[in-house]
Amino acid sequence: MKIILMLLPILFSSQFIAAAEIDRIWLTHKTNDPSKIVVNWMSDEPGDSVVHFGLSVEYGETVRIDDETTIHHVEIPLKHRDTSYHYSVSTGEQRSADATFKAYPTDILRVAVVADWQGKPDLSAIVNDDVHLLLTAGDNIARLWDKCGEGEKDCIKPYEELIEEYPKLFRSTPFMPALGNHDREIRPRGSKPPAESAYDVDALAFKRFFELPDDEWKWHFDLTEFDLRLVALDFNHISDFGTTWQTCHAFDENSEQFHWYRKLMKQPHGYVVTLYNERNASVRNQAQKQWHEQFLRGTCCITGFGYFAERAEVDGVPYYNTSLSGKGNQYPDPNSKILADEDSYILLTVKRGGAMSVEIKSLNSTVLDRQIYERR
């Protein structure tokens, strides 16, 4: 009898651990609008992919995919606004605890933009801003090769570690990253171009881990109720293009990327925010300054190129730089209006039918710069 009594707590404890063992969960969008959301997770053992969701812990709706896998991407519909969704995921006998995320609002939308995530700092300031969507301007990890081995293109371990660092943030806030050079560094860069490519231009690991719209290495996302379009471009280390240091897709006037962006900007939304991971002054001069001509149709551009906080302005177009590692060497834009040696992020706040504010904020929540933009 004593043996049975000792075993029962162990059995119950083991069952509880199994029921709550899935904890690497993140939310993304692969549609171009917020009508659906993708629930992503990692499981220790391969199995099916099941999401239970609803407006309460009783859930009420289920989406199941029967493929055997350890990385799971399940898209669920979002029919409601101005509320919170509850959800849990399961793979075989593995379970997650209940989690929640905010449905998109109908009055005021808050979006944060970060970059240069290699240091994994405290993001309490962003959590306190209670954002509806988290974006990046590239460099979401330090590199691939030191965790995965040189030349491994589809290894996702550094991205798993990013999710593990901020479990509550990623399971409660939709996340849409843009690409940087660090996101696809598969070999040491070295002091001169190596014999084999140092970067995976196709970004296989990034695309395997994140479910995003369009080609994933470039994407756009529309929040029509707020007349807002968000666009991620693939610009980084463009001076290395054509060498084994090349990191990004083509960007000349005949490139797929340029034609795609120009088409998006022919009938732009009232607000267009463009993200990338290259020096602003370099990007706007590409294709005989035709990129800048397209940016004139939007609201602002945001890069994570430099380790500093900055707002520049050219022909009325604001060019921002933000970095979570903002105390590095500064490379000011020739048209810089504000430059700060601060770890920072950018907060976009859009009032439905009204203006958009863009704030550069330090990680201690200090507002370094605030601008108001009207619809174009």
Regions found by a protein language model. Give the residues of each.
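Active-site glycine-centered loops adjacent to acidic/histidine catalytic or metal-binding residues
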Residues: D116, G138-D139, G180-N181, L233, ...
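Residue-level marker for buried hydrophobic side chains located in beta-strands
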Residues: V111-V113, L134-T136, P177-A178, T274, ...
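Acidic, histidine-bearing metal-coordination/catalytic regions of metal-dependent phosphoesterases
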Residues: A18-V113, W117-Q118, T349-R376
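Extended active-site neighborhood of metal-dependent phosphoesterases/phosphodiesterases
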Residues: S84-S96, T100, P105, C148-R262, ...
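Acidic-and-aromatic substrate-binding clefts and catalytic sites of carbohydrate-active enzymes
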Residues: W117-P121, L212, N280-N285
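Bacterial N-terminal signal peptides
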Residues: L5-Q15
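Short acidic, glycine-rich surface-loop motifs adjacent to enzyme active sites
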Residues: L144, M265-V283
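An acidic-aromatic substrate-binding cleft motif
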Residues: S96-C148, E152
